Amino acid sequence: EGVKVMDAVFRCGNGEKCTDNFHHFGLAAIIDIQTGIVVTPAIDKLNQKYYIHPRTKEQIVGFKIPSWTKIINTVKKAALVKPNIRFIGWDVAVQENGRICIIEGNCTADPDITQMPDQIGKWPKYREVIFER
């Protein structure tokens, strides 16, 4: 019923490049949807694990995403603009002033990034929601 947030991923640059693009060696880690806390080590596309960010030396697991409830509410509201699209991967940034900024919505979001950090396939979960009537 309504919009369902299926997964959330924390993405960041690797310390050498400023991009968070996973396929250009950005890092990705799973966020607990309920709490907004990062629950897995980050990985890169070579599946190297990072418990500590290589440049900032900040701990990754346990990091609390700022303004998490606002992020969830923002993407749910945005998803209602086109309710006939059953699957959207939202790229969202939290600005320094706390403002939530939607960068883009992807109707062909990359499934790698939601599955590699915890090594759990997501298709059964997604299929159920995408095809429910």
Where are the regions a protein language model picked out?
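Phosphate-binding site of ATP-dependent enzymes
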Residues: 1-44
